[in-house]
Structure formats: C-alpha cells, structure tokens
C-alpha cells in the first residue's frame, strides 16, 4: 500500500469521531485540546502573517488554525485525493495534490512545515532539495530513533521511515541549513495522545472501522502496553532548521 491509499480509505466524517472537528492527526499534550496545543507550540517559530507551505498537510488542521490564529497565508501539499478534496470543498486554503517527491514550489515561503509527515518520505533528501530554494526556514515535528532497536513491523505498517537525529540533521546540512531549535515531546505526549485516541475510537461503529482505523486502534494499544520501551527507542521532537 502507498501513502495516498493509506489516507484515502477513511472519510473525514469518521475521522472527526476520532481526532475532533479540526482533524489534527498527530500527537498532542497539555490541558484542554491536546492536539491543538501541539500546533500552538509551533507559533513561536512562525511570525504573524507569514507565508507557510504545509508539506503533508493532512485534512488541513494545522493550516486552518495557522490561518485563523496567526493570519498566515497557507498553501498545503498532500498526496491524498480525499484530503485535497476536503480542504478545497471547505475552502480552508489553497492545496496542491501532489507527491512531495515530484513537487517543486513556484514561489517563496517564509516557512515550510512538516508536522509528522517527514517520516512518510521515501527520499527526504530529494524533497528537501525540491523546496530548499523556496524558503530559509523549515520546521519539523518529527519522530526519530534514540536507539538501534528499530521497531520494523510497526514502522512498516505505518509506511514510515524513522531516522536518528544526526541523520536528519545531515539531510539539512547538505543544503546549508543549521539546526537552531530542538525540543523533545514524546515522553509527556505519548500517553495522553494514546488515551485520547482509544477513548474516541470507541465511538466508531464496526462498519466504519476501515483498515486505517483498525491499525490506529491496534497501534494505540501496542503503544500503551509497551510505552516504556517505545520511549527508550523513539523520540518526537520539534526541530527548526534555518539558513
């Protein structure tokens, strides 16, 4: 299965039951709306009214609140037809339906953003090369390996590629980007996110349990049961690269 098929098998209506009306599909933390909190954390790195290219924009949750709260001009890129249609039909912001490996922006952006989407890239160096002439700031919220215990089956099920931090930094240094900010989140965000997913997955009817929804439930239970090992092996960090 390819990434586009993986994200096209479940409708936004089903996803709202699991991740809320803003359709933030990522890890969260804090009090109240934990998924929104995770996006708000990024505001400190993005000036108001910035132009933002949201790479792997999902159903537009991040771009929607950046536009609403910060007055940003957001353009999204997604490989998913379902996600692209949802963003366009709801007039959230301009969206490009494309594989990032085949996409080269035709304008300059203040920020390029990857929120838990960099891990889906098969050739991250190619994608970074494609966008590197269009921005001087790239922000990642991304998973990374902390040990050599690679959870291959879990990662493969999610069509992910997880690198060590030094590998990620090397992708950027080859294009003259320097790491200017790094913060770890997984040790305080994994547990509340898993509990949030599991609680909401109970609202999904059996007929609505697509392959993606089934995988999320299995994964959430796996993460809950193996939390200590996961946190030893995998991190989730905000990384800001600039030049």
Q: What are the language-model segments listed below?
A:
Residues 125-137:
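A short glycine-rich, Lys/Arg-flanked "PGG" loop and its adjoining helix->strand segment in the class I
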Residues 32-49:
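Conserved alpha-helix/loop element of class I SAM-dependent methyltransferases that forms part
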Residues 59-93, 97:
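Class I SAM-dependent methyltransferase SAM/SAH-binding core
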Residues 187-230:
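C-terminal helical/coil "lid" or tail adjacent to the Rossmann-like core of SAM-dependent
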Residues 1-26:
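N-terminal, positively charged/glycine-rich alpha-helical extensions of SAM-dependent methyltransferases
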Residues 161-176:
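Short alpha-helix
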Residues 113:
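A conserved beta-strand element that flanks and buttresses the S-adenosyl-L-methionine
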Residues 143-160:
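Short, glycine-/aromatic-enriched active-site segment of Class I SAM-dependent methyltransferases
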């Amino acid at each position: 299965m390819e990434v586009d098929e993986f994200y096209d098998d479940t409708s936004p209506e089903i996803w709202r039951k699991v991740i809320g009306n803003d359709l933030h599909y990522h890890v969260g933390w804090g009090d109240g709306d934990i998924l929104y909190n995770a996006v708000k954390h990024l505001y400190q790195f993005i000036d108001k009214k910035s132009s933002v290219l949201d790479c792997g924009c999902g159903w537009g949750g991040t771009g929607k609140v950046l536009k609403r709260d910060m007055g940003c001009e957001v353009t999204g890129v997604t490989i998913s037809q379902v996600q692209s249609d949802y963003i366009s039909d709801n007039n959230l912001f301009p969206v490009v339906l494309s594989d990032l490996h085949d996409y080269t922006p035709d304008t300059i952006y203040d920020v390029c953003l990857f929120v838990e989407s960099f891990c889906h890239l098969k050739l991250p160096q190619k994608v970074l090369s494609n966008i590197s002439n269009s921005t001087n700031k790239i922000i990642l919220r991304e998973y990374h390996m902390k040990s050599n215990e690679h959870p291959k089956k879990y990662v493969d099920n999610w069509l992910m590629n997880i690198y060590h931090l030094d590998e990620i930094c090397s992708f950027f240094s080859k294009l003259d980007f320097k790491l200017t900010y790094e913060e770890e989140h997984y040790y305080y965000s994994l547990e509340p996110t898993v509990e949030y997913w599991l609680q909401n997955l109970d609202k999904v009817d059996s007929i609505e349990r697509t392959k993606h929804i089934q995988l999320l439930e299995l994964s959430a239970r796996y993460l809950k049961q193996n939390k200590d090992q996961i946190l030893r092996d995998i991190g989730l960090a905000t990384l800001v690269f600039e030049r």
